[in-house]
């Protein structure tokens, strides 16, 4: 009976996504970051790319977790038709911030759930943001924080970059990387329900350390 609270595998190595799930009351059996080729196809639109990444991650994870519900997420930053990189170095972060300075952009997070029986369920959320004009000093200071490394669009909304944002239209949690309403809806659709960490610990489902 207790398995209904943790009956899924999270296809992500992101500590932030794991923490957000726990805040929402979901505790995956395991978290595994599936490795796939994340190169955009020629002419691929940002929305299509986000959906494809989440789907391919879920399929790869399902191959090794055959009898489990698996859920994956992929966040993509874009400006117009341009897909911005997931920053892997300071130069990527600088490129993204210089490009986004004074501009409106979009963040897509696509969620993909593959059920135990192999059924695919997918939801995608879009949020629009606008950055203020950034000075060279602000960009250099942000580079020194290293917050943008590994982030779509080269920034983390939970850190110093929140001071760059003039407005957000849409889900804030989508910008963080895990839209809450859609996650809850998908997991509940396969019988995975929310529970507190304390209740899980008292039932012996999960180590509360």
UniProtKB/Swiss-Prot annotation:
**Annotated catalysed reactions:** a ribonucleoside 5'-triphosphate + H2O = a ribonucleoside 5'-phosphate + diphosphate + H(+); a 2'-deoxyribonucleoside 5'-triphosphate + H2O = a 2'-deoxyribonucleoside 5'-phosphate + diphosphate + H(+)
Put simply, this protein is called Nucleoside triphosphate pyrophosphatase
> What subcellular locations does the record give?
Cytoplasm
Kindly list the organism's lineage: Bacteria, Pseudomonadati, Pseudomonadota, Alphaproteobacteria, Rickettsiales
A single BP term in Gene Ontology: nucleotide metabolic process
The record, for PANTHER family, names: BIFUNCTIONAL DTTP/UTP PYROPHOSPHATASE/METHYLTRANSFERASE PROTEIN-RELATED (PTHR43213), BIFUNCTIONAL DTTP_UTP PYROPHOSPHATASE_METHYLTRANSFERASE PROTEIN-RELATED (PTHR43213:SF5)
Q: Which GO terms describe its cellular component?
A: cytoplasm
> Coiled coil located at which positions?
none
Organism the protein comes from: Neorickettsia sennetsu (strain ATCC VR-367 / Miyayama) (Ehrlichia sennetsu)
Q: Which Pfam families match?
A: Maf (PF02545)
This enzyme's EC code(s): 3.6.1.9
